[in-house]
Amino acid sequence: MEEPTPRDTAAVHRPLRLGANLPPRFYRGGAAIARFRDEPVADDHVPEDWVASPTTLFGEAALGLSRLPGGPLLRHAVAAAPEVWLGPAHVRRFGADPALLVKLLDAGQRLPVHCHPGDDWARRHLGTRWGKTESWVVLATGTADAAVHLGFREQVDPETLAGWVERQDAEAILGALHRVPVEPGDAILVPAGIPHTIGEGVFVVELQQPSDLSVMLEWRDFGLDGDREGHLGVGYTTALTCVDRSGWGAERLASLRRSRGAGRATGPGVERVLPPEADRFFRAERVRPRPEARLEASFSVLIVTAGWGTLETGDGPAAELHRGDTLLVPHAAGEQVLRGDGLELIRCLPPHPEGANDA
């Protein structure tokens, strides 16, 4: 596949509207994504829209990668002109890597309980740069009792966990986790290692580190061969060492969650929605222009969640925004001004290039 040249990408100084990127998955979902985008339902097993993705599915050469309007892969475009896309400070810290993956995720059924390794574990056992800390910003819930499950309620010893997984005792695994009711607007940080699942009917924006690494603790009813696909190729004896088996008390668990309106204001109409501990992995802002909101230059992914409006940059005409739009904003687009009637969006950002954020 021919890569774009630097000249092809150097002219990118304005936001780009992105279409859906729906790799097939093993669990059901996708209808909420189609409704959100006002598009036909593509399939009942496309529950994830990988937005502005520089990442492939685990074990795949290209599946999962996003294409830009006109055809080039985002990964190739960024490699050709990293400072245009990411900004000099980001490139100094992370290289030509966005350090971010964003998804729309529609749980058409409860996901199997699983977890993701951290950076150190991934480097040691897989030779990869990124583990997978993630977060969820809840857009909608399909049931009145919508919930996620995460974190063991009590310490679980290695032998007990290994036995549950070997026997595929789904009831014991799920029953050992905290059940956390959720509603639209909630934001939850999911640290690497913590076992978790998203309940049926929950529709989220997922921000995560740019990897597709999962250790499956449960697969019995999901059409997966866990003995072959569930352990990242290292075997379960090693894979289960990435699991956080500690007990999560109520106060510790509550530190991972922010309800709508409980975030940190970073400017007029802009609210940081995740706990501060998320900033070293990614940042998420809820933007509601009143009547406008100004955003500093940064590589970012915009998910328009309500209303309509415009996005202005220093180059070219204003872009119209409507609910369901997803846009990629290069760093070179500069400062952005948002205006609109009932406009609301989630702005997804990579880790701050200077380390600890000052917000």
Q: Across the structure, where does each feature detected by a protein language model lie?
A:
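Transition-metal
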Residues: 1-156, 220-262, 284, 353
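A short beta-loop-beta micro-motif enriched in histidine and acidic residues
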Residues: 97, 108, 125-134, 175, ...
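Ligand-binding loop in jelly-roll beta-barrel domains
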Residues: 106-110, 141-144, 194-213, 318, ...
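Short, basic/aromatic beta-hairpin or loop at an interaction surface
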Residues: 157-170, 297-310
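Loop-centered beta-sheet repeat module
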Residues: 165-216
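Short acidic-glycine-tyrosine-enriched beta hairpin
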Residues: 177-189, 313-333
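Short beta-strand segments in beta-sandwich/barrel cores
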Residues: 292, 307-312, 326
